[in-house]
A protein has these predicted regions:
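Extracytoplasmic/periplasmic ligand-capture domains
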Residues: 1-98, 102, 111-175
Length: 175
């Protein structure tokens, strides 16, 4: 648990500790009270990312892993690009990481050195680009502003979040 690790570090029970973004300000203030020094070791090698299930297979129970319409969405490059353009990474970094992060455009961060490719395609936050890509893929908005695919299926999908309790702390609920 993060709180225990930080407490052990601050009181000298451990010699080193990683600091999460949410603990950074407390640790920075505690530096004057406890006998330790914070060293900036540079960018983290960890990343947070999501991907879409594109498994067209059938489960052992004989059911498809995905409904056909969702498989069509997730395998359409324009749909995925639209999601990337509609994703406010800076806003997420500010809200979840308290500004202690950087926007990445690959699952390989700069801290990984020679394996990082800074020349990958970048998808800036642009609602206009996202909407244009969705429309080019046959999606549309009905009179209630619900996004639907070309067959009239509302666009809804689940996100599985490993650290969903962190989002709960700020009042964000994913279903």
């Amino acid at each position: 648990e993060s709180n225990t690790a930080i407490a052990h570090f601050a009181t000298g029970k451990s010699d080193a500790s990683g600091i999460s973004a949410e603990d950074f300000e407390w640790v920075k203030r505690a530096q004057g009270t406890y006998d330790f020094t914070i060293y900036n070791r540079g960018p983290s090698a960890s990343v947070n990312f999501f991907w879409f299930n594109q498994n067209a297979g059938i489960s052992e129970e004989g059911r498809p892993y995905l409904p056909k319409h969702k498989l069509e969405w997730f395998t359409d490059k324009r749909f995925r690009q639209a999601i990337l353009h509609g994703f406010n990474r800076e806003g997420l970094i500010d809200a979840i990481l308290f500004g202690k992060g950087e926007v990445l455009h690959s699952i390989i961060p700069p801290a990984k050195g020679e394996w990082h490719n800074p020349n990958v395609r970048k998808y800036d936050y642009s609602i206009a680009k996202a909407k244009a890509l969705l429309q080019s893929a046959g999606f549309y908005w009905d009179s209630d502003r619900t996004l639907k695919d070309r067959n009239g299926e509302p666009v809804r999908f689940n996100l599985l979040l490993v650290e969903s309790d962190r989002y709960d702390q700020i009042g964000v609920t994913f279903v």
